């Protein structure tokens, strides 16, 4: 099966923790431009920014990116992607990769990897990536999403909680990682087949998705298989807060 794919970058202006986040300047360029440039370095046939704000559309046009204006009332980035897939008239079996608009350091290799993984695993309707958790602070951080997979590499669940809970080890100490437990951090990049996006939107959010604020749980709730692989090149964490923004600025302005 072909692994040709389209990248869509959802970019909301009204971020709760960092308003106007896609347009925040990093080394003289808006953050969304950094993300777009990284996506353009991948093997994607097309890279599209999907936004709910005309200011972001105009900024994208200024540096040559294709941008589509979408509705403001989407429940998640995946819901926004579904609108874009419909606007673009993508075939049901076309692969779409969701690259978060706050990942200015995302390696192009992981974009290619997640698209290729979905193409290779026809039993899955979504694919995503993970990396090992190597310190206990990360493990207990609710801003870090944990993922557990089965022996075939399909997701069993995702959670902000410490998952799985090593009962005996944590009864002794929570100061170090339990031995023999392969804890993994979910990396928020997804590949889908365009036809699946229509189904995803039609289902609407479930209580589990709303409780954890994790859109992928809607797919699991409906029995969708999600393929999870360890990233060949783990990306740095994205920009969620003003502190994250300053960290990325220091890296890219050095």
Curated annotation (Swiss-Prot):
Compartment(s) of residence: Cytoplasm
Signal peptide annotation: none
Keyword entries, A-Z: Cytoplasm, Lipopolysaccharide biosynthesis, Nucleotidyltransferase, Transferase
Reactions mediated catalytically: 3-deoxy-alpha-D-manno-oct-2-ulosonate + CTP = CMP-3-deoxy-beta-D-manno-octulosonate + diphosphate
Enzyme Commission code(s) on record: 2.7.7.38
A GO CC term attached to the entry: cytosol
UniProt keyword Acetylation present: no
Any one GO biological process: CMP-keto-3-deoxy-D-manno-octulosonic acid biosynthetic process
GO molecular function, one term: 3-deoxy-manno-octulosonate cytidylyltransferase activity
Biological role stated in the UniProt entry: Activates KDO (a required 8-carbon sugar) for incorporation into bacterial lipopolysaccharide in Gram-negative bacteria.
Family statement drawn from the similarity comment of this UniProt entry: Belongs to the KdsB family.
HAMAP family: KdsB
Protein name: 3-deoxy-manno-octulosonate cytidylyltransferase
Source organism of the structure: Pseudomonas fluorescens (strain ATCC BAA-477 / NRRL B-23932 / Pf-5)
């Amino acid at each position: 099966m072909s692994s040709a794919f389209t990248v869509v970058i959802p970019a909301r202006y009204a971020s709760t923790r960092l308003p106007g986040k896609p347009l925040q300047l990093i080394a003289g360029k808006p953050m969304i431009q950094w993300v777009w440039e990284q996506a353009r370095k991948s093997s994607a046939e097309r890279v599209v920014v999907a936004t709910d704000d005309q200011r972001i559309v105009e900024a994208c046009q200024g540096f040559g990116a294709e941008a589509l204006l979408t509705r403001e009332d989407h429940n998640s980035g995946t819901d926004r992607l579904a609108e874009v897939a419909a606007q673009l008239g993508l075939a049901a079996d076309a692969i779409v990769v969701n690259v978060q608009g706050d990942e200015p350091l995302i390696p192009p290799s992981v974009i290619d990897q997640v698209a290729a993984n979905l193409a290779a695993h026809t039993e899955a309707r979504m694919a995503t990536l993970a990396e090992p958790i190597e310190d206990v602070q990360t493990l207990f951080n609710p801003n870090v999403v944990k993922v557990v997979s089965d022996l075939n590499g399909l997701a069993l669940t995702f959670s902000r909680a410490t998952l799985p809970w090593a009962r005996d080890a944590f009864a002794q100490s929570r100061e170090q990682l339990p031995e023999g437990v392969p804890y993994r951090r979910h990396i928020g990049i997804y590949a889908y087949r365009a036809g699946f996006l229509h189904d995803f939107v039609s289902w609407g959010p479930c209580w589990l998705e709303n409780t954890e604020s994790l859109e992928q749980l809607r797919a699991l709730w409906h029995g969708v298989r999600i393929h999870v692989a360890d990233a060949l090149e783990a990306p740095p964490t994205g920009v969620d807060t003003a502190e994250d923004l300053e960290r990325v600025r220091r890296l890219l302005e050095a």
